[in-house]
Amino acid sequence: MGCSGSKNASNPKDGAASKGGKDGKTTADRKVAWERIRCAIPRDKDAESKSRRIELFKQFDTNGTGKLGFREVLDGCYSILKLDEFTTHLPDIVQRAFDKAKDLGNKVKGVGEEDLVEFLEFRLMLCYIYDIFELTVIFDTMDKDGSLLLELHEFKEALPKLKEWGVDITDATTVFNEIDTNGSGVVTFDEFSCWAVTKKLQVSGDPDDEENGANEGDGANAGDGVPAAEGSA
């Protein structure tokens, strides 16, 4: 489920989503899983969500270092959040989220060598995963015929929904052609999701903005990013 490559345009629009789905999960599978997962990911900025994030970070941090490697994050997404109920492409999604959070954290802290995620970046990583999952649900509603591919008319019909999500489009045809990177005349989920996440970040800023980053830092020990006790957050 990477950011490049389209499904071969010769693949017929045959309603495959109702049978096996874009990644082995059906639309019904994802809908059921999403209702649980959207509540399980503590991405909001309120005190309760932050407290849940602290506990979740500790559960992910099996080595007790205050820093998460990719394997710890992936294992936690499987065993604790059980995100594989939604998709069979979880490693790819988590890798993207991990890299995004890590890179932003290194930029904020003025370092660029660590291949780790600390508590400061943890919320951003969760937000990115949430966004990809939410985009999958949106794509399911846009893909009216269940072909796993979007045509221009389906994209145009979904403009109000995309605006609600945070992406306002004025020239649908031009944007559709930009998303369709291989010129096949249809858009795959990979093309759509990579475009939508990037566009949302350009318009609204990273899901974990600078103000929130500072607040999250209050919940971590300076220097090592280990979550402090809940009362000190």
From Swiss-Prot:
Ca(2+) 1 binds at D61, N63, T65, K67, E72. Residues 214-225 have a biased composition (Low complexity). Residues 1-11 have a biased composition (Polar residues). The gene is FCABP. GO terms for molecular function: calcium ion binding. It comes from the Eukaryota. This is Flagellar calcium-binding protein TB-17. Belongs to the calflagin family. Ca(2+) 2 binds at D143, D145, S147, E154. Residues 20-29 have a biased composition (Basic and acidic residues). Ca(2+) 3 binds at D180, N182, S184, E191. One of its GO terms (cellular component) is cilium. PROSITE patterns: EF_HAND_1, EF_HAND_2. InterPro entries: Calflagin-bd (IPR003299), EF-hand-dom_pair (IPR011992), EF_Hand_1_Ca_BS (IPR018247), EF_hand_dom (IPR002048), FCABP_EF-hand (IPR054322). Residues 48-83, 130-165, 167-202 form the EF-hand domain. May contribute to the rapid motility of the trypanosomes, playing a role either in flagellar structure or in calcium metabolism. Could alternate between a GDP-bound inactive form to a calcium/GTP-bound active form. Residues 1-29, 203-233 are annotated as: Disordered. It is found in: Cell projection, Cilium, Flagellum. Its main location: other. Gene3D superfamilies: EF-hand.
